[in-house]
A protein has these predicted regions:
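Short, solvent-exposed secondary-structure boundary motifs
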Residues: 1-6, 51-53, 100
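Membrane-proximal alpha-helical anchors
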Residues: 1-33, 38-42, 124
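Hydrophobic beta-strand residues in large extracellular and virion-surface proteins
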Residues: 11, 22-24, 37, 64, ...
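Short acidic, gly/pro-rich beta-turn/loop elements at beta-sheet edges
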Residues: 21, 32-34, 47, 82-84, ...
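Short, low-complexity, polar/charged sequence segments that are solvent-exposed and flexible
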Residues: 28-32, 41-44, 56-57, 91-93, ...
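Glycine-rich loops and low-complexity Gly/Arg-rich segments
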Residues: 34-39, 47-50, 60-64, 96-100, ...
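Intrinsically disordered, low-complexity Pro/Gly/Ser/Thr-rich segments with frequent PxxP/GP/PP motifs
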Residues: 47-81
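Terminal connector regions
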Residues: 68, 73-124
Length: 124
């Protein structure tokens, strides 16, 4: 089995119309089984009231279909950066394919790249 014949789970941040989301996506033709996502930092959302990383979706997604995306609202742009403790967040992502082969990857995010984007988003 080659890597192109395997699930590929990614975790990313999205800014959309001054709102911030986390996206969990299987960007392959193959399902991902028992997906677990471990962030290096808490991600505080909903006006500073909720640790988004406490959601069950980070503990286990039993089946993530091919090209399936789960998009989680975090907060408004300004509130998100106001409550953000660290701008660098890593995600350790664990999952398996249907044959039981396990995969692990680390996805590194530097959220500083998003800090000035709101000015461009507002203009559109």
């Amino acid at each position: 089995m080659t890597n192109t014949d395997a699930p590929n789970v990614i975790v990313d941040f999205e800014i959309d119309a001054e709102l911030v989301f986390i996206s969990i996506k299987n960007s392959s033709n193959y399902p991902a089984i028992n997906v677990r996502i471990k962030p290096s930092e808490s991600i505080i959302g909903l006006g500073g009231k909720k640790d988004i990383t406490d959601l069950a979706v980070f503990n286990e997604i039993r089946y993530l279909a091919p090209y399936k995306e789960i998009k989680i609202f975090i907060d408004s742009y300004h509130s998100f950066f106001e409550h953000l403790k660290k701008t660098e967040i890593d995600f350790a992502v664990y999952y398996a394919d249907e044959n039981g082969q396990t995969f692990r990857k680390k996805i590194l995010h530097d959220l500083n790249i998003y800090k000035d984007l709101v000015f461009f988003i507002k203009k559109n």
